[in-house]
């Protein structure tokens, strides 16, 4: 049984406490206040219930009513405190009854009970109120840490994780932590104090009865553990299914045009219903098991009261070691201690659900940041000479076969300052990977990428990326205004700077014609704009950043002829005086590059100007001729 209790009750509680140790320290002052108010609430509760004994004795004339001998002096020993305090309390009540009346004494004691209850409930409220800043603050901190970690992780992490799964952890899992773990904070800080004070009171009333009561706690705890044993595993499965659901929603939103084009609404609805129903079935089992906590603890608590009432009756009727009003006070205190124990049992069902979600959150929080500054990195503020790929090989890990798959093999390339280098080749030849290595989105397995002779791994990541501007095939815009998107990389830019950048990017005209000009919102991912407009806003953003190095990744491949002309014109303005590395699908857009490198299966197989490569009649000319057809 000891091993079972350790695995089913103490192990989850240990994990729970470890989570609190991670997140509670900033809120220690609230924790201290909560403990203080909980102690005050427990003491006041004991005194308010203690008032029941004289009330019962007066009301029912037990043993002839209030009975006391003469006033007793305390002899200084701890063992006599209870006897002296009880005797003198009864003595003063008896004197009050003689001087006034029993009914007035009953009223005074009743008012005392009401006053103590008022103070107790006030302390109880304050103890709960001081927990709320801890609870909400921890959830906020988890979300902040999760978001900060997402922005810190390398791109390689997200190539192996579904966006919907990450969103599910950010939303559903954090919410489950709040509902399951943080809702148990009050229980953790309040109930141990209540149980301790009530337990001491029970011992003071009758140690024999308390010893008898303790014998029933382990089997009751074991019985509760049986019900909650599988809850954590089921909750983990439920949250995984919730991630599948969110991933499918995200996938559907991204592919809605294709779904409609192929009349696949019914198919997608069926797929979603399958995933959603699986989640519903699993979470239903979890919730049913969780809902057993209250009735189970209520039933076991009632059994305990009945057993104690039977044994207490023996002590009253057969041995006379305790009187009737005192046994009632004992039962009231026992019931008061059962309620916190019920909360513990309820938490034993709630906490495993939250722990399962926290495990999923920690998969992100504890993920290793692969791209980070080394200790004492070199700082760079300008680009003076050249970019160099020196014997660079890059591979990604095929987790299915547990092997490296090389995308680039022994790449050697020098890009002098002010020159434009174009990378061409079939899909999968490694063009975009080469671009990603310059700002160090990934680290190479072999060789090195150098900026002005310094390995990018030795540079501060922030300094390196400040030198680089990006314009991609898909313009990445945010759900904000034109102004906020253009100044995204330079928050201190003036309105004049933003307007000038928009003019150079051929975006000024359509921006100023919009409803609120530069303050007009562009919708989610720039959804209110055409493809060409989105790309020109993206170019304006790069112009405003004014980087010495420019990376273009098929910036015009998805545009119509008119939009391509406007964007190409904007790009040519942007490329002036800058070092540019461009990937192009349409070879016509890179004819004027200083050097064109042709990649095939991860290697540079040809290099030269457009005219030189056409004359060679090699791989580049084949690509060129195919586009002329």
Give the residues covered by each predicted segment.
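Membrane-integrated ABC transporters
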Residues: 1-50, 59-113, 119, 126-131, ...
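Transmembrane helices of ABC transporter permease
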Residues: 33-40, 186-237, 310-323, 339
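Hydrophobic alpha-helical transmembrane bundles that constitute the permease/transmembrane domains
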Residues: 39-47, 114-125, 177-180, 184-199, ...
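Juxtamembrane helix-loop junctions of ABC transporter transmembrane domains
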Residues: 45-53, 112-163, 167, 171, ...
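Conserved catalytic Walker-motif region of ABC-type ATPase nucleotide-binding domains
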Residues: 150, 272, 361, 389-391
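Helix-loop-helix
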Residues: 201-215, 289-359, 364-365
